Design a protein with these regions (language model features):
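Short beta-strand segments within Ig-like beta-sandwich modules, predominantly Fibronectin type-III
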Residues: 86-91, 120-122
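Primarily secretory-pathway and cell-envelope proteins
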Residues: 20-74, 112-137
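Short, surface-exposed beta-strand/beta-hairpin micro-motifs centered on an aromatic residue
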Residues: 93-99
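A short tyrosine-centered beta-strand micro-motif
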Residues: 103-109
Length: 137
């Protein structure tokens, strides 16, 4: 029992330090349905996103016509295996990192009426990189 309390305390400390690190880097951590995610990654925040990418196993990268530019408004939806939306948010830039639990997830992105989606299995310590390349207007 005592060992469990020590482990729980260390985990709480780690989570607090992780959030503090992101805040110190100027990244706001969002949370929906118990899932943490960060948005943006353009301009000055790109370097900060690279520093915390290991904490988020799902990396959504948004391009337009194959170019890494500010994509403008992009709506991201993360759906569970039942098809229920667990996260719905604006990308806020070319990167959208998500920390869902293991399972089958569908990530959808919508920009100017164009919809893209990808379903993947997230297991163990695996990282998923999901590239969404939208058409140029």
């Amino acid at each position: 029992m005592r060992a469990w309390l020590v482990v729980a305390g260390l985990m709480a400390l780690y989570v607090g330090v992780a959030a503090a690190d992101e805040a110190a880097l100027g990244i706001k951590v969002h949370k929906q349905s118990g899932i943490n995610y960060i948005t943006g990654g353009g301009g000055d925040t790109k370097q900060a996103f690279e520093q915390v990418r290991g904490r988020y196993p799902v990396h959504v990268q948004i391009t337009v016509g194959g170019e890494h530019v500010d994509p403008g408004p992009v709506r991201i939806t993360l759906r569970d295996v039942k098809g229920e939306a667990q996260v719905e948010a604006d990308a806020g830039g070319p990167l959208f990192f998500i920390n869902p639990p293991s399972g089958r997830w569908t990530v959808e992105a919508e920009r100017n009426g164009e919809k893209l989606a990808k379903t993947s299995d997230l297991t163990g310590r695996r990282y998923l990189v999901i590239d969404f390349d939208f058409s140029k207007p």
